[in-house]
Amino acid sequence: MAGHSKWSQIKRTKAVVDAKRGAVFTRLGREIMVAARAGADPAGNFQLRTAISKARAAGVPASNIERAIAKGSGQAGDGAQLEDVRYEGYGPGGMAVLVEALTDNRNRTAADLRLAFSKNGGNLGENGCVAYLFEHRSEVILNAGPDDEERLLESLLELDADGYELLDGAVVVHGPFEALESLQDGLRHADWNVREWGHHWSAQTSVSVNDPETARSCLKLLDALDGLDDVRSVSANLDLADELEID
């Protein structure tokens, strides 16, 4: 499958295990604020419903969620001027990196990213230098396993999906960017336990890394970028060899 990489699986695990709780709350609150610009009612705002669902899954208190909605929709009178920004660069071994950020200060965010790249063997590039290597797509994660594969295939025949991956304790369903809402709704209606959903950048070509030291350097850079307060997501075309031993 195009864009498959062990980094994707590592990233999902680390997002749960390693994330600092306060930073996660701040990041998710910002996503809610941006989504709420299109309307404070989740029933008519799919982006807001998605952001709220992610926040609840991460344990964000209801009061924080309500406050973020009020700020973003202007009800609190102090709506933050946040904007989505995309940055691109290279890491060790020629790894392409795409970073999505949500910021109220582009200069600060760019400086933080540039420092993280330079300290970890990479460099921040110009807009467009690696974006062509990625495709923006939909992703729905189900609580399911290999035993459910036959029923899953039957469900996907009725939906706008074009692939899936079996992971430990989960199934990741892929589809076109514009199909996210219909895809997750359809899976719910087919009685699947939907864990999370969202858009992600799928690498169309990958950089294979077989050297443990290079692999560690790549992961160190990706972790450093993902740990920055303004960063929403980090995507890379890193493909780690299955037999690779990483401390």
UniProtKB/Swiss-Prot annotation:
Its main location: cytoplasm. Keywords: Cytoplasm, DNA-binding, Transcription, Transcription regulation. InterPro entries: Integrase-like_N (IPR017856), TACO1_YebC-like_2nd/3rd_dom (IPR048300), TACO1_YebC_N (IPR049083), Transcrip_reg_TACO1-like (IPR002876), Transcrip_reg_TACO1-like_dom3 (IPR026564), YebC-like (IPR029072). Coiled coil: none annotated. One of its GO terms (cellular component) is cytosol. Belongs to the TACO1 family. This is Probable transcriptional regulatory protein Syncc9605_2132. It comes from Synechococcus sp. (strain CC9605). The lineage of its organism: Bacteria, Bacillati, Cyanobacteriota, Cyanophyceae, Synechococcales.
